[in-house]
Structure formats: C-alpha cells, structure tokens
C-alpha cells in the first residue's frame, strides 16, 4: 500500500499422471490452488462480498470502499490403551512467549486441549512441561502426516517448484494429496533427460478397497511406507528410483502466538527501514525480542483505527500460502501492521534493482502464476484487493511471491487519494470503471493484474511510458491499450489484452489466469527458447 509517486501404463511403460487434466478446448489446466496443510477453516460467509459487478452509479462512487481445513488423520497411537492420542513434532520450535513450549523435531506430545484451533495446549513427554504449541507443527504419531516425505495439500505446481530447487538430485521426491481424486495421493519425482533437462513427473497413487496402495496394479502395498521403500530400491517402471526426500521448509505459524492479535507497541523493535510511501513506512523488525517480522507503520491520518480494525478482522481470516500473513496489529495511532517478513522485499524493487533483472521468461511467468493463485483464492473468498501491482507483491527465498496489502486501499482517507486523482492514486494500474466511477470488483483487480504482467516482462518499467495520469485515463477510455513489450511473446500480450477488456465481465477469472500461466510452457509456448532479455 502506498502512492505510486513514492514507491498410467503398466510394467515398464508407466507414464506420469498429471493431477489436472488439460481441457480439450483451451489447453489450459483448471486446478485447485495450493493451500497450506494445516490452516484452519474460515467460512466464506464471514467475509463480505464486495463483487457486485452491477453496482449503480451511486454505489460505485464510494471511493476505495464501497480455508480449507485439513484435520489430522491417519494411524493413531494411543498411550497405554487410554485413548490418548500422541502427537509428534515435525519441526523445531523456539518458544516466543512464557506460555509457549519449546520443542525439537521428533519430540512426542500429549495434547491437553485442541479446541483453540491454531495453538494447542500440550504436555511434552520428553520434558514433562506443558504449554502452547502451533498445531501445524505436529502430527499424530505413526500417521502419514508424520512422514518426512508427506507434503499434504501441496499443489502440482508448488511441488515442481520445490523439487526443481537448486541442488536437488535426480530422484528427489515427495508425496502429496491428489488435487483431482479424493482419497488418492500423488508421487512427484525430479527427473532428467536430454530433451527436457530437469523436470518433474507425477504419478497417481490409488487406494485399494482393502486399504492398500498402488501405482500399477502389479505392484501393490499395504502402506505408503512400503511403497516408498520399494521404489527407493528400484525404479520398477517409474522414471527413476526414489533417492532423496524433498526439503520441507518450516512453515509459518498461524499468528505469532496464542492470543497475540493486538500487541503492545513496546513488544516491537524496528530494526531497518525497508521502504516508504505516501501513507506508510515498512520496517524489518522483531516481536518479543525473538520473532522476525515486517512492520508497516501508518502515517497519522491515513485511516481511522476503527475502520482499520474492522477490516483487519476480515483480512486475518484470509489464509493462503500466496498471501502475506497478517500476524498482529497495534490499533492505537500510529497504527502498526505486523506481517510475516519476506527476505527479498517488493517485486518492483526486486525486478528493477535486484536479482530479478537477470530472470528469464519461465521464472517471470511462474511468479505471475503465483500471484494469480493468490488472487484466485481472494476471488473464491469474494474479496477484492483494490491495489494490485508489483509494489504490493513481496518476494522471498526461492522466488516465492506473496500478495500484500489486500483490502487496505479502501480505508485510506487522504483527500487527493480518495478523489482518484493526482500523483498519490495508482491510475496506471486501475481499471477505468474503478478510476472514473469507483466501481471496484474482482474484475478491476484482473485489469490490474494485466498491468502487473507488463511490469514483470519489462523488469519494473512504469506502465504507459511517456504518458501522465490524465493522458492514460483519456486514452484508455478511447480504447488505447499498451502494445506488446519488447521480447514478450504475442500469446502473453494477448492475455494482457484479455485482462483489459472494457466490459469487466468479459475479463477472465483468476482461476483461468492461474491455469493458463501454470501450463504456459506446455500448452501455449512449448517451443520457447531463452533470448538475451527474456
């Protein structure tokens, strides 16, 4: 947030099983978004539906206003026949408050109270101590979820990103839930050949009626563990034998700690200023002296604390691995917004001055696909971003992109900004119906996404070069659209044009955009060869 000015065949012929089918008509894949394994469920009804595409003029003139739960299942071990389920730590965790419990990977727990959702009261069987633990850091002992190779609700594209990370050898693998077949799993393996180079193959793991598992019916196993052991010893028709388990990065906790939503200002330490805009400064900092966070400090008068707190209650329920997580707030002026820290900063700066300058088209399209995945989630939740552009996308290690500042723009009370004119308002990213009449919907976000695509392929160039805001508004109303950027494939520019349709309802959905971009180099540009720039 901020102003523009400032900122399966059998035997040896097994084939890889794609989780998403390619549609006959378009060649694009429509799959569910990857979502974190243990995020809690929040009903759509708790989030207002801002997407009234047929808003009247009066409604439109209001300015900038106006999860899948994955329960712990599997084979459970009880303690001494008492019916007490034991859980096992999947990661190390260092206590952040006096009520938290520090623990190490592999440590066993008795869960005393799991009714709190994201933070459970537990007793360590190692130390005997009790305290709160993050529920997404543990799994039932001996369950599939406790296996290092099990990645839960990881999407196909995210599995490929994980496996193709630098340093992973051929045969690196993981198992995840199937996106298309309920109760089935997918085995994803890193492979290599002369034609494709490094790539990933996916195999569907099906369940037998008697509870067993198989990839091919001639090789059946009682457990997934036995299946993994078998294919680790020999490929037996797979592209390669299983060699190394993919690295499963430690996830973000859901919130900073139990009941740590409104935090004291003195619990936050501002360490390094990362950037500033017309309405806020962004700092890297720590909470409670032990947890790295990003802190947005809003300038006085930017928005009312009451309006912000009301919107923040909605924002904190939006949880997806392509959205920057809102951790906590300081609700008294000056308002502080505490979020997860992303090491590479904003996508805009990353593209202009950072590692992004050297990226080729496959990386850039993948980053766009990640943004589309996050926006597809926002779309499903009937929410709107209102200020989608590269400055509001944050980049982490491994070129992971997450959407920030969703929903905040409508709360800004600055007169120049709310009048949708002047240097503070992002005219060049805003759909004409939103800029002229205040009709902000998910379809105006789609328009903005088309502009963001130009930022990606031009490495952060300001849209509509050589034109001021007034000229942009006038020319766009007359039908002008930006030409195809240098070295950008025609097919990608056609997608931008599709996002910039005058009629909002003719613009694509983010679900469509995600599928198109995720399969871009197989369905649309299979003959792509890298050039000097892209």
Curated annotation (Swiss-Prot):
It is found in: Cytoplasm; Nucleus; Cell membrane; Perikaryon. Associates through its SH3 domain, to the p85 subunit of phosphatidylinositol 3-kinase. GO terms for biological process: cell differentiation; cell surface receptor protein tyrosine kinase signaling pathway; forebrain development; neuron migration; peptidyl-tyrosine phosphorylation; reelin-mediated signaling pathway; regulation of cell shape; T cell receptor signaling pathway. Thymus and spleen. Its cofactor is Mn(2+). Residues 268-521 form the Protein kinase domain. Transmembrane segments: none annotated. Residues 15-39 are annotated as: Disordered. This is Tyrosine-protein kinase Fyn. SUPFAM superfamilies: Protein kinase-like (PK-like) (SSF56112), SH2 domain (SSF55550), SH3-domain (SSF50044).
């Amino acid at each position: 947030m901020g102003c523009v000015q400032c900122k399966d065949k059998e035997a040896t012929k097994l084939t890889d099983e794609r989780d998403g089918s390619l549609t006959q008509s378009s060649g694009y894949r429509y799959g569910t978004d990857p979502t974190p394994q243990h995020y809690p469920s929040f009903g759509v009804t708790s989030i207002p539906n801002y997407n009234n595409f047929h808003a009247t003029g009066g409604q439109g003139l209001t300015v900038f206003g106006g999860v899948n739960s994955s329960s712990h299942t599997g084979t459970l071990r009880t303690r001494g026949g008492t019916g007490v389920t034991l859980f096992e730590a999947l990661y190390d965790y260092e206590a952040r408050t006096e009520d938290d419990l520090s623990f190490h990977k592999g440590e066993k727990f008795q869960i005393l109270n799991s009714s709190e959702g994201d933070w459970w009261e537990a007793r360590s069987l190692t130390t005997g101590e009790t305290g709160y633990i993050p529920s997404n850091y543990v799994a039932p002992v001996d369950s599939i979820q406790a296996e290092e190779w099990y990645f839960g609700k990881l999407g196909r594209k995210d599995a490929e990103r994980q496996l193709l990370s630098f340093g992973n050898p051929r045969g690196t693998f993981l198992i995840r839930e199937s996106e298309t077949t309920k109760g089935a799993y997918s085995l994803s393996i890193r492979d290599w050949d002369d034609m494709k180079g490094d790539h990933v193959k996916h195999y569907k793991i099906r369940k037998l009626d008697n509870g067993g598992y198989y990839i091919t019916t001639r090789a059946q196993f009682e457990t997934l563990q036995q299946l993994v052991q078998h294919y680790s010893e020999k490929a037996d028709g797979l592209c390669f034998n299983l060699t190394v388990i993919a690295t499963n990065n430690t996830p973000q906790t859901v919130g900073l700690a139990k009941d740590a939503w409104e935090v004291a200002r003195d619990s936050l330490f501002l360490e390094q200023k990362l950037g500033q805009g017309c309405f806020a400064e962004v700092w890297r900092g720590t909470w409670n002296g032990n947890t790295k966070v990003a802190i947005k400090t809003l300038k006085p008068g930017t928005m009312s604390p009451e309006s912000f707190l009301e919107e923040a209650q909605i924002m904190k329920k939006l949880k997806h691995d392509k959205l920057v997580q809102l951790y906590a707030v300081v609700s008294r002026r000056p308002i502080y917004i505490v979020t997860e820290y992303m090491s590479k900063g904003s996508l805009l700066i990353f593209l202009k001055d950072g590692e992004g300058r050297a990226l080729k088209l496959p990386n850039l399209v993948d980053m766009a696909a990640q943004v589309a995945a996050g926006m597809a989630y926002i779309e499903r939740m009937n929410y709107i971003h209102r200020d989608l552009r590269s400055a509001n996308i944050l980049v982490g290690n491994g070129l992971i992109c997450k959407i920030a500042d969703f929903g905040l723009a409508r709360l800004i009370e600055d007169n120049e900004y709310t009048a949708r004119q002047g240097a503070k308002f992002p005219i060049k990213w805003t759909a004409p119906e939103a800029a002229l009449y205040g009709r902000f919907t998910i379809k105006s976000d789609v328009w903005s996404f088309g502009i963001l695509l130009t930022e990606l392929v031009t490495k952060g160039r300001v849209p509509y070069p050589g034109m001021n805001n007034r000229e942009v508004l006038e020319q766009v109303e007359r039908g002008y659209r930006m030409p195809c950027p240098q070295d950008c494939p025609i097919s990608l520019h056609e997608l931008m044009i599709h996002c910039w349709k005058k009629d909002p309802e003719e613009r694509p959905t983010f679900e469509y955009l995600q599928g198109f971009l995720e399969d871009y180099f197989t369905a649309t540009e299979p003959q792509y060869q890298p050039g000097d720039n892209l």
